[in-house]
């Protein structure tokens, strides 16, 4: 059984990680341990590079907390060019996989508050009245009318980032 450390305690992110690992390696093939670690970037990262750096930093910090795992996974959400997205970084002892998620364009009324220094999650909670929306369906669920959720979009990116770990062409 694979020991997977998720560098997050966010249920939406953990669900995406668990689902992707089960699909790639088989149902029940992994045990996920969640740890809370720092990203080393602002609470609301801006731009692709800052967001990816946050995910890479979380993986590095998770490795320090739990060095005996088989995989370390981080999902860092950010804002880039008026849209929300995330970077997924997965590492094993000898390999790294990274993938950027799909992007969701955000309404200007939301972006104004985020640009003023507020994080997207709290802004969306104020807008919707849903407490801790970032730990649930997120802005993605709200603006797609539930057709997609934060977790479903993250899931796709985790599957993509896992490609180097199970596809022989990468070796």
From Swiss-Prot:
Biological process annotations from GO: nucleotide metabolic process; thiamine metabolic process
Protein name as catalogued: Inosine/xanthosine triphosphatase
Binding, substrate: 8-13
Cofactor note: Binds 1 divalent metal cation per subunit; can use either Mg(2+) or Mn(2+).
GO MF terms, alphabetically ordered: ITPase activity; metal ion binding; nucleotide binding; ribonucleoside triphosphate phosphatase activity
Cofactor: Mg(2+); Mn(2+)
Enzyme class per UniProt: hydrolase
UniProt keyword terms in alphabetical order: Hydrolase, Magnesium, Manganese, Metal-binding, Nucleotide metabolism, Nucleotide-binding
Reactions it catalyzes: XTP + H2O = XDP + phosphate + H(+); ITP + H2O = IDP + phosphate + H(+)
EC id: 3.6.1.73
Binding positions for Mg(2+) per the UniProt entry: 38
């Amino acid at each position: 059984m694979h020991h997977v450390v998720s560098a997050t305690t966010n249920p939406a992110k953990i669900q995406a990680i668990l689902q992707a690992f089960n699909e790639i390696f088989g149902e029940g093939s992994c045990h996920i341990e969640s740890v809370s670690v720092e990203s080393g970037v602002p609470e609301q990262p801006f731009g692709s590079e800052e967001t990816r750096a946050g995910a890479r930093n979380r993986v590095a910090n998770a490795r320090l907390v739990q060095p005996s795992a088989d995989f370390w996974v981080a999902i860092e959400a950010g804002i880039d060019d008026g849209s929300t997205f995330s970077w997924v970084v997965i590492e094993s002892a000898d390999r790294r996989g990274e993938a950027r998620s799909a992007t969701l364009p955000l309404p200007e009324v939301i972006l104004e508050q985020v640009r003023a220094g507020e994080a997207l999650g709290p802004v969306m909670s104020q807008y919707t009245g849903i407490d801790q929306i970032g730990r649930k369906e997120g802005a993605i669920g709200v603006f797609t009318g539930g057709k997609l959720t934060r977790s479903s979009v993250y899931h796709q990116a985790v599957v993509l980032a896992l490609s180097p770990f199970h596809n022989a062409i990468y070796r």
